[in-house]
Amino acid sequence: MKTTVAVLGPGAVGGTFAVQFLNADDRTICVAPPATVQLMAFSGISLETNGSPPHVGRPEVTEHLSFPVELLLVSVRPDQLQDAIERVDPAAVAEGVVLPLLNGLEHMGPLRERFPGRVAAGALSRFDAYRVGRMQIVRKTPMALVTMGSDELPREELERAGRILERAGI
């Protein structure tokens, strides 16, 4: 059975990770506003890594996540967080890990309120990517390092999330 992963905010970080999850054969769903969903459904996500030819990934796309996922990666802009998390039904992560990869700690309050007991603290390093188009990403680093921890989630759940990331080369 495939692991189901959702990416909330498929920009440079989220889009890169979505393609990596697809390459690891995970069921990958990107959650985004209507215009982005339409564009992704049409073009997919183009990812160029270290000057290699672009690879196009075609994740599932939706405006609202309502079915269960094992991992929800949150990578939206801070000013879009509140609207973005409304796109995810809390029941969808009732048995999953919510992993924000955002700067600062201000986002933890709204995430914990929306998804009580499901949020890990996450940090991303050794990663450099940027968008050259709406769904075109250039990645300059060969790998990414994600560190996560939680006082609320059981160790086994964090380890399961870690294995999902490792399989995707993260």
Which residues are covered by each model-predicted region?
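NAD(P)+-binding Rossmann beta1-loop-alpha1 motif at the extreme N-terminus of oxidoreductases
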Residues: 1-53
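Short, charged/polar "capping" segments at the starts of alpha-helices
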Residues: 36-40, 107-109, 156
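Short, conserved catalytic or adaptor-binding loops enriched in Gly and charged residues
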Residues: 51-56, 163-164
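Rossmann-like NAD(P)(H) cofactor-binding subdomain of soluble oxidoreductases
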Residues: 54-137
